[in-house]
A protein has these predicted regions:
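N-terminal amphipathic/basic-hydrophobic helices that include classical n-h-c signal peptides
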Residues: 1-9
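Charged, low-complexity intrinsically disordered segments
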Residues: 8-164
Length: 164
């Protein structure tokens, strides 16, 4: 819980797409290309990956074609479907790969991410204690941690590009 209790002005909270820093949300309409397939949002891709190699793999094209990220999320969260056996181990890596691709692909939001400097980025989700901070700010904030890691990677890459 200590990481989220640092001084408030050094923290950027994000959650809904239409709010400040909404491009940090996985629901933002920034497409990514992963494994030669275009996905409308990070959320579409992430939810589909839950079923790769599972008995319910047939849901992947349905998630891919979902009209909105909300629909993709609902399809991926359906508790009657069987997700891949390694999901708990793989999900953070998969999310990071998708987030890195999103910010590498779209220079406008890459600049927004880089403009946050060294500020703490926190997904202000009231009901997600893994990806976000949860209602009482004690969540693990894995999405915020991924964004900060991607920000550092992109900063290093942009400094190398300037140096060359």
């Amino acid at each position: 819980s200590g990481i989220l209790n640092s001084s408030f002005h050094m923290t950027i909270y994000f959650y809904k797409v239409w709010q400040p820093y909404g491009c940090f949300s996985n629901f933002s309409l920034h497409s990514i290309e992963m494994d030669n397939t275009f996905w409308s949002t990070v959320e579409h891709y992430y939810q589909a990956q839950k079923f790769l190699g599972s008995p319910d793999e047939k849901i992947i094209p349905v998630i891919h074609q979902a009209c909105t990220p909300e629909e993709a999320a609902a399809l991926g969260r359906c508790s009657t479907r069987q997700i891949r056996s390694d999901w708990e181990v793989a999900k953070t890596r998969i999310m990071r790969e998708a987030v890195l691709k999103k910010f590498s692909t779209h220079s406008d939001i890459k600049e927004i991410l880089l403009s946050t400097g060294d500020k703490l980025l926190v997904e202000d989700s009231p009901n997600d204690y893994f990806w976000g901070c949860g209602a009482n700010k004690t969540g693990q904030n894995h999405l915020g941690q991924i964004l900060m890691s991607v920000r550092e990677e992109l900063r290093i890459l942009s400094m190398k590009a300037v140096a060359n």
